[in-house]
């Protein structure tokens, strides 16, 4: 069992055996507490644009897809615990990006 950040996983996954299961507590959505992210969001707000769907969500998906590539190749399971995927309107976009997928009834081991 490895508990790590998305950035750690992206930088080190090639050094580890392919996982059978990856459990993501939260999606890799950039924090507004990061000054660069906050400035970019503020710029989009001033332009009247949807800063979440224009910036944060695409960046999160661009992080997520390569982060799970080895899992997909090996036929492993991805469990996303982030309730926002089911509870927010943008969750469908996340699920579409992960297709094909199916809901898990339980986590490993079976």
Protein language model regions, located:
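Short, low-complexity, polybasic intrinsically disordered segments
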Residues: 87-110
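Conserved RecA-like P-loop NTPase helicase motor core
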Residues: 2-88
């Amino acid at each position: 069992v490895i508990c790590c950040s998305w950035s750690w996983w992206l930088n080190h996954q090639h050094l580890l055996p392919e996982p059978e299961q990856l459990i993501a507590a939260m999606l890799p959505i950039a924090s507004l507490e990061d000054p660069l992210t906050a400035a970019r969001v503020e710029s989009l707000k001033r332009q009247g644009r949807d800063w979440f769907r224009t910036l944060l969500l695409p960046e999160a998906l661009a992080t997520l897809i390569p982060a799970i590539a080895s899992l997909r190749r090996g036929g492993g399971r991805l469990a996303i615990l982030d309730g926002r995927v089911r509870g927010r309107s943008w969750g469908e976009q996340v699920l579409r990006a992960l297709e094909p997928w199916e809901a898990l009834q339980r986590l490993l081991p079976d």
